[in-house]
Amino acid sequence: MKDFVYLASQSPRRRQLLEQMGVRYELLLATPDEDTELLERVMPGEAPLTYVKRVTQLKLEAAVLRMQKRQLPLAPVLCADTTVALGRNILGKPENEQDALRFLKTLSGQTHRVLTAVAVASGRRRLLSVSVSKVSFAPMKLSEIKAYVATGEPFGKAGAYGIQGLAACHISAIQGSYTGIMGLPIFETAELLKQL
């Protein structure tokens, strides 16, 4: 398995999970002139699985170009994207407090899917894998949702929650990959790195 990658992600959770795997990394982040929000725009009628694969592939190609432009030594590039889906509805990262409240009200008492796509590039090779997990939220009172949103934890996270944080108090069950729900499925990532 490759033990060094360029990580094209700002997520501290992805860094933590790579460290857990024993994979060294160097961050390969977008510059302010790159329109990363454009990459994450949902197309009309786009299914969650199609969306997460498309966004991850676009992020990967942008990161490979970034590596080339910066003339960095060649090494595998890794990126990932996580989306939360309730039915065909995609819940991205909340833009504000109202978004976070709406997302969490929607998820309260429901079981939803968390899809995390991870992709790697090495030379001309491109590999992608998707982890799909189910997360069940217990019914939450509005006061509990507001208190959680007030912590600031929902921001920057798909679906407005982080399973590894305070939201865990409201999650009654998960089925699938805990690390996939966090943002980088370790098993799938290791399998991809073995193939390079």
List each model region and its residues:
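N-terminal polybasic phosphate/anion-binding patch
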Residues: 1-76, 89, 195-196
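Acidic/polar active-site rim loop that often engages polyanionic ligands
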Residues: 36-41, 86, 124-131
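Generic enzyme active-site microenvironment
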Residues: 79
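Short beta-strand and adjoining strand-loop segment in the mid-core
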Residues: 88-92, 119, 130-138
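Anionic-ligand binding region
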Residues: 101-107, 116-133
